[in-house]
UniProtKB/Swiss-Prot annotation:
It comes from the Bacteria. It is found in: Cell inner membrane. The gene is atpF. F(1)F(0) ATP synthase produces ATP from ADP in the presence of a proton or sodium gradient. F-type ATPases consist of two structural domains, F(1) containing the extramembraneous catalytic core and F(0) containing the membrane proton channel, linked together by a central stalk and a peripheral stalk. During catalysis, ATP synthesis in the catalytic domain of F(1) is coupled via a rotary mechanism of the central stalk subunits to proton translocation. The keyword Glycoprotein does not apply. This is ATP synthase subunit b.
Length: 171
């Protein structure tokens, strides 16, 4: 109602103030009535289509807004999923690094133990070899000395001396 009154005031008031002749000599009222009839006919025939256009536009905008909001929610869910996967990957990486460190420590211990055993074995073998070589050199020296004594005519030994030397050599 306020809109209609405002419209009548806006259209009619300037015409009344600025008119130079009386209202009876003009066709203003007929023109206003024709304009009102024109607006009413236009309203009657075009209102539904104009309203439909605006409703369709509003629905299209609403649909686009809904689609954008769905895309936004989808992006947020994907971001959260990616964050979770990133955290899981970091945790797996930490676990892998810890497992690798532990495995390296165990391998180091294993190889250190094996190296110690190998060193002990080599040490024992070396000591045995040294002892064997010492005995071998001693036996060779005794054999050489006995051969010289037996072959030389300077030294005269009796059988008891030979038996004594041989028993010492054997032991």
């Amino acid at each position: 109602m306020k809109k209609i009154a405002f419209f009548v005031i806006c259209v009619g008031f300037p015409s009344l103030i600025f008119a130079s002749a009386s209202i009876q000599e003009s066709d203003f009222i007929q023109r206003v009535i024709n304009f009102v009839i024109f607006v009413a006919i236009l309203w009657y025939f075009a209102f539904d289509s104009i309203k439909g256009i605006f409703v369709n536009r509003r629905n299209a905008i609403s649909a686009r807004l809904q689609e954008v909001q769905e895309n936004l929610h989808k992006a947020k869910r994907e971001k959260e999923t990616a964050q979770k996967r990133l955290e899981e990957s970091k945790e797996k990486a930490k676990n892998i690094v810890n497992a690798a460190k532990q495995e390296a420590y165990l391998l180091e211990q294993k190889y250190n133990d094996q190296i110690k055993k190998d060193i002990e074995t080599l040490k024992y073998a070396l000591e045995s070899n040294i002892e064997f070589e010492r005995r071998k050199i001693t036996h060779e020296a005794v054999d050489e000395l006995l051969n010289k004594l037996i072959q030389s005519d300077d030294v005269q030994l009796n059988k008891e001396d030979y038996v004594n030397i041989i028993t010492k050599r054997i032991s």
